[in-house]
């Protein structure tokens, strides 16, 4: 029986190391074990260091055993827990949504920094800030981007859209959990919506249209599908088996599919002086910038993440 902190920490490390995550080095595996002990049992790092032989209670053992059993089946630790931390908040996750990742928090940081550094009113077309600020998060998933921005800008109006009703249900619960009420959700297929625009269809179907009050946007942000199908062989089986394929992959012959469609949507719905913010595939940073320039966007900026990879793009609509 795994009764002590020291022994169960070793077991958790063994499980994490064996479940197909070669990206985890020994330090990260230890951190994962420590995370579970803190999240599941409330045992802080200080307590672990001071009392490594402390006997876990029967309830603690049962809860940890359940988590470990799911991890042994290849379930990501966040899904085994049922939640992930993002931007200081706890978000429900499931196989219906992507697990929020640190590089996405960097994208949110960029937007927050930009908006807080600009005046609240300006005649300068380069400033998108108006009152109230109107933001749209396309492909919201768990809602981590939209909810974080809604919390940072409580007087803003934020629209979170996704093609998946299951994802939207999770995002709604997360918004409720965080007491965010300046957020509206809509089920919209962006690719279909843009196809209708480009086909000159007079009326977009009612169930696939932007709601009233969100027709003119200051900010569009998106972390859309951007992994080519031929990259799947290089990915962890844990991601492939437990995160939604629809949120991950694009055709090999059209890797910028969603960026082109969202940029086209921006041409219709962004205010003059509004901005696009994207998370991108590091392999297509320059190509994404070129695409936006060709579509009439200005001041296109490519930014690297903390790991030094091209990961984010910002562009001005004018």
Please name every model-derived segment.
Residues 1-84:
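N-terminal auxiliary segments of SAM/dcSAM-dependent transferases
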Residues 18-23, 114-129, 195-214, 270:
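Alpha-helix termini
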Residues 152-157, 161-317:
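S-adenosylmethionine
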Residues 2, 57-61, 98-102, 252-256, ...:
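Short, solvent-exposed loop/helix junctions and linker helices
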Residues 35, 63-66, 106, 110, ...:
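Alpha-helical elements of Rossmann-like donor-binding domains used by nucleotide-donor carbohydrate transfer enzymes
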Residues 43-44, 51, 76, 81, ...:
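Residue-level signal for pocket-adjacent positions within structured domains
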Residues 51-52, 65-154, 158-173, 187, ...:
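SAM-dependent Rossmann-like transferase core, predominantly class I methyltransferases
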């Amino acid at each position: 029986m795994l009764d002590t902190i020291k022994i169960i920490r070793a077991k958790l490390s063994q499980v994490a190391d064996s479940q197909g995550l070669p990206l985890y080095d020994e330090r990260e595996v230890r951190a994962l074990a420590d995370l579970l002990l803190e999240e599941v049992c409330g045992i802080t790092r200080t307590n672990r260091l001071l009392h490594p032989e402390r006997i876990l209670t029967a309830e603690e053992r049962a809860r940890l055993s359940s988590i470990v059993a799911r991890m042994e089946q290849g379930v990501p630790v966040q899904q085994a827990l049922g939640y992930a931390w993002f931007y200081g908040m706890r978000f429900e996750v499931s196989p219906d949504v992507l697990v929020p990742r640190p590089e996405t928090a960097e994208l949110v940081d960029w937007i927050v920094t930009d908006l807080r550094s600009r005046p609240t009113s300006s005649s300068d077309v380069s400033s998108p800030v108006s009152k109230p600020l109107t933001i749209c998060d396309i492909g919201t998933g768990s809602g981590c981007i939209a909810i974080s921005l809604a919390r940072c800008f409580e007087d803003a109006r934020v629209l979170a859209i996704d093609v998946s009703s299951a994802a939207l249900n999770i995002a709604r619960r997360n918004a409720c959990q965080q007491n965010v009420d300046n957020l509206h959700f809509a089920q919209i297929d962006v690719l279909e919506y843009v196809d209708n625009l480009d086909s000159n269809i007079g009326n977009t179907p009612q169930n696939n249209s932007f709601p009233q009050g969100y027709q003119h946007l200051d900010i569009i942000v998106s972390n859309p599908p951007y992994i080519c199908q031929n990259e799947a062989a290089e990915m962890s089986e844990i991601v492939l088996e437990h995160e939604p394929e629809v949120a991950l992959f694009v055709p090999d012959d059209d890797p910028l599919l969603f960026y082109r469609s969202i940029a086209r949507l921006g041409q219709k719905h962004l205010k003059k002086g509004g901005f696009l913010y994207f998370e991108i595939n590091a392999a297509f940073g320059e190509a994404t910038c070129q695409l936006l320039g060709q579509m009439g966007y200005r001041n296109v900026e490519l930014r690297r993440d903390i790991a030094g990879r091209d990961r984010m793009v910002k562009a001005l609509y004018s």
